[in-house]
């Protein structure tokens, strides 16, 4: 059993007797109130999606499924194809990846975990941090150096995030895949 706060994208939870892939989580905290976790879920069996809200301390069944370390091979619309160390290929529907699809690029070297339910590849969990190239960002604003200055940037794969003001187009940056936040320039 995990608390709602411990669940992250790529996990599979049992809800109302059906397995659901967690595609996105967003935790909000307010003054004296407990944390609230919003989750975007996709039903593995019915191919339907929903958004639901839990209290941070709510307990839920995190289904322990077979997981394999795989690397990304290619995209064959609408499937992402991953390969394990023994060269077996597994198709994962694009809809099951959620926000992770914005970080998947051709030639990526990071090892992902592909999750299986009843022999079918149902989700992919990215490593906690990945390194991507900034494909576009505005030039730094001169003289704007007070505090932590952030600006929008697009990275290879298509994800958009806020980066530090000193980051330029072409720089390699480290991204936390759980939150989609800029960590550092590499």
Curated annotation (Swiss-Prot):
Transmembrane segments: none
Compartment(s): Cytoplasm
Pathway the protein acts in: Protein biosynthesis; polypeptide chain elongation
Molecular function in Gene Ontology: translation elongation factor activity
Keyword Cytoplasm: yes
Superkingdom classification of source: Bacteria
GO cellular component: cytoplasm
Assigned protein family: Belongs to the elongation factor P family.
Functional summary from the UniProt entry: Involved in peptide bond synthesis. Stimulates efficient translation and peptide-bond synthesis on native or reconstituted 70S ribosomes in vitro. Probably functions indirectly by altering the affinity of the ribosome for aminoacyl-tRNA, thus increasing their reactivity as acceptors for peptidyl transferase.
Protein name: Elongation factor P
Organism: Shewanella woodyi (strain ATCC 51908 / MS32)
Higher taxonomy: Bacteria, Pseudomonadati, Pseudomonadota, Gammaproteobacteria, Alteromonadales
Protein encoded by which gene: efp
